[in-house]
Amino acid sequence: MSTQTNTKSDFSELDWDKQDGLIPAVIQNHLSGKVLMLGYMDKAALEQTLATGDVTFFSRSKQRLWTKGETSGHTLKLVAIDKDCDNDSLLVQVLPNGPTCHKGTESCWLDGNAHPFLNNLAELIASRKGQSPESSYTASLFARGTKRIAQKVGEEGLETALAAATHDKEELVNEASDLMYHLLVLLEDQALSLSDITANLLARHQKAQRK
């Protein structure tokens, strides 16, 4: 997927003197919002990151520039970068190519989710797959198969639309919640996730911006 880098910050205002020429850079998955890692950049690392689109750090242990994934291939493609209000740290949004942590995990934190409930709900739904239909409503949906799950998505979509048409906001919230839940079940049934949907929406957005 091609990326369109968004760099609206004025990096000339960065305070490089506060930490001996280094600035911490928080790395965040652009699609999921998950925090992946923390690295440090000097001026050269920031310039190389902006020039190449591959996130580059200054390695304090190796005392040189280090492009993430230069040996593993697990690169971080730059999408957007911004500085904080004190001009002494960076938020770098990326599209990761493989696991970010050197231990082979997606994140260097056990739980780096920006929106943990939806992710946790999706994981809970996935855990119900293959369980006894009597154990939960979700398990019973999986047992009844794709057609029934798809039917429920259609029903909840119609009920959501009707709630909006009648300007019943309380019912709209309830029906939209039902729709979201059943959509997550359908995505899991088809071996897809919210990240797949987000990636597709991002690609469409970038295509529209290029026109």
Curated annotation (Swiss-Prot):
GO biological process: L-histidine biosynthetic process
GO CC term (a single one): cytoplasm
EC numbers on record: 3.5.4.19, 3.6.1.31
Principal place of residence: cytoplasm
Pathway: Amino-acid biosynthesis; L-histidine biosynthesis; L-histidine from 5-phospho-alpha-D-ribose 1-diphosphate: step 2/9; Amino-acid biosynthesis; L-histidine biosynthesis; L-histidine from 5-phospho-alpha-D-ribose 1-diphosphate: step 3/9
Region annotated Phosphoribosyl-AMP cyclohydrolase, chain positions: 1-117
InterPro entries: His_synth_HisIE, HisE, PRib-ATP_PPHydrolase-like, PRib_AMP_CycHydrolase_dom, PRib_AMP_CycHydrolase_sf
Pfam families, alphabetized: PRA-CH, PRA-PH
Compartments reported by the entry: Cytoplasm
Phosphoribosyl-ATP pyrophosphohydrolase: annotated span: 118-211
Catalytic reactions of this protein: 1-(5-phospho-beta-D-ribosyl)-ATP + H2O = 1-(5-phospho-beta-D-ribosyl)-5'-AMP + diphosphate + H(+); 1-(5-phospho-beta-D-ribosyl)-5'-AMP + H2O = 1-(5-phospho-beta-D-ribosyl)-5-[(5-phospho-beta-D-ribosylamino)methylideneamino]imidazole-4-carboxamide
Recorded GO MF terms: ATP binding; phosphoribosyl-AMP cyclohydrolase activity; phosphoribosyl-ATP diphosphatase activity
Alphabetic keyword roster: Amino-acid biosynthesis, ATP-binding, Cytoplasm, Histidine biosynthesis, Hydrolase, Multifunctional enzyme, Nucleotide-binding
Database matches in PANTHER family: HISTIDINE BIOSYNTHESIS BIFUNCTIONAL PROTEIN, HISTIDINE BIOSYNTHESIS BIFUNCTIONAL PROTEIN HISIE
Stated family: In the N-terminal section; belongs to the PRA-CH family. In the C-terminal section; belongs to the PRA-PH family.
Protein name as annotated: Histidine biosynthesis bifunctional protein HisIE
Organism: Shewanella oneidensis (strain ATCC 700550 / JCM 31522 / CIP 106686 / LMG 19005 / NCIMB 14063 / MR-1)
Species lineage: Bacteria, Pseudomonadati, Pseudomonadota, Gammaproteobacteria, Alteromonadales
